[in-house]
């Protein structure tokens, strides 16, 4: 992002994508993104996970809470990786979860995500 901020695309309707994994990326990446936003780049978090970048290694709740707070402060849209039942830490569903839904099949990552969505939805609805 910092590189893009020094030489931004000169087109209308452009947004820059930020990917992070809470177990791998931290303050250094947030600082680079903040600098890019200060320089005028529009940013969206188009992929993030609660795990390491390889999709595994456990769920890093404290780090994800820090990232979520940062995204809220900076009013960034975000998309979580991944809504699947693969046997890895980043998956929101437990292996073998029902295809048609059953929010009781959430992995630790999914439990955190579900809680965030409920909290943020309650804030949005109360506006």
Predicted stretch roles:
Residues 1-77, 92-112:
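Extracellular glycoside hydrolase catalytic/binding regions
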Residues 103-127:
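Low-complexity, Gly/Ser/Thr/Pro-rich intrinsically disordered linker/tail segments
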